[in-house]
Amino acid sequence: MDTYSGQNGWADTSNASPWGDTNDTMPIDNSLSNSLSGLQLNEDINTVRANLTESIWGTERTGAPNNVETGLEAKDSLNVSTNFNELNTAILSPTSSTSNIEEQNSFTESLESWINEVRKTYNPQQLDIISIEEIPEREGLLFKHANYSVKHLIDLPNTEPPKNRTVVRRYSDFLWLQEVLLKRYPFRMIPDLPPKKIGSQNLDPVFLNKRRIGLSKFINLVMKHPKLSKDDLVLTFLTVPTDLTSWRKQVSYDTADEFTDKRISKDFVKIWKKDLAEIWNNTANCIDELIDKWTKISILVDRHEKRLQIIANERKIMNDLIHDVGNLTKSVYPIDQNPTILDINSGMTVISKHIEKTNENYNQQALDTKQKVLPKFRMYTDILRALKNVFERYKMLATNNVSMLQKHIDLNLQKLEDMKGKPDASGQEYDRIKTTIRKDRKIMYEQSNRAWLIRECILEEFTIFQETQFMITGCFQEWAKVQSTYSSLNLNEWENVTNHILEMPLSRE
């Protein structure tokens, strides 16, 4: 994980596929093996891209030999006839017995209950609880940098809030936090950071404001995440009043990933269903297109906001011109000869007021679109990208060599079998091979356990991601609300001005 660099996610250079052919292996005991009877894992959907030696989504799952414990240490006794392939079909062979059907129904209910509980932990549409403002004074001797006032609006758990619940942070502090989260939670939806600068734009006020908004989105997405929001370093970032760079030099902190010293739950293995992997495959195959389409929608909403500003500016120019025309008509149409010009000028005054009022509406509509509508559209894009990055990091980090270890174990077991009955066989060599087998089995268990933990983690992320579907509704509801509000206001203005214009004279009669 320490090989990760940059702030824009993992490079999309790997040809490894998270959905490739797998022999997802987890040594388990007989009781767990029996409970998995009839459970089929997912068949490969994207074999063209598959080249991982081992993946967490698979067509089948190999098990540990009957003489291997589920702990990290294998038993001392070695049955040469036993190998890791023996349980491939045994633990996955389906039966049609009534008890098994009832058991599978129970697993399905357990899965639904698990999913419901996980989904309750996440609400991406909840109000932001962190506000970020740029501090006007810039620091630095040669290279000036911006500081940000980071304020949490509610009390955070197990922390002592600083004065006014506010701390001062730099962009580099946010970058450090993201890197730490990526190391600790490589398969969680870690949001992207805005760029530090683009060319010479690091002093441009428009760019700085966009970066501030991006930092605010980042930290608020982190705080809405059920797992990330409870991380001790996240809470430290938000509450330690001292300079974070100095704090990092004075203390030691752990960046090991969340799977360290953790074992997969037997309950999760029981509720696993192949349909889940098929859904993930479909998501991985279309996530890029969804991001592309939604980004284009967001761009069109943004362009509409820009057009509203252009319309407002043009109408202001039109209003000034109408005022000038009213002044000039008094000279062109002498009042003593054309008393109707007074009524016409009076009508143009009404038109001018109408333009001023509709101008206010256009400006306010543009502002509401910018502050209320666009952030919702862009927030959804950020979460989609975060999910995509989970898939990309999986390609980079979720590989293992379980299949190679299994072949190595089989080879050594055969060596032990061949050494039987040979008087010239070395006892020391025999013991060395036995020790190697134990070590390989231990590593195989650890890697298989990690593969299942990754599967559970990504299922949690994909499950909470399902709550983001309601963000689509929220986006268009806010968009329609703004459109409807100002369309009604402008319609009223047009009706009023039309009534006045109809009273303007069309002839001398």
Curated annotation (Swiss-Prot):
Molecular-function annotations in GO: identical protein binding; phosphatidylinositol-3-phosphate binding
Main location, first listed in the record: cytoplasm
Subcellular location: Cytoplasm; Membrane
One Pfam family in the UniProt entry: PX
Record's GO cellular component terms: cytosol; endosome; membrane; nucleus
Record: residues binding a 1,2-diacyl-sn-glycero-3-phospho-(1D-myo-inositol-3-phosphate): R170, S172, K196, R211
Region Disordered: start-end pairs: 1-28
Domain notes: The PX domain binds phosphatidylinositol 3-phosphate which is necessary for peripheral membrane localization.
Family: Belongs to the sorting nexin family.
Name of this protein: Sorting nexin MVP1
Gene: MVP1
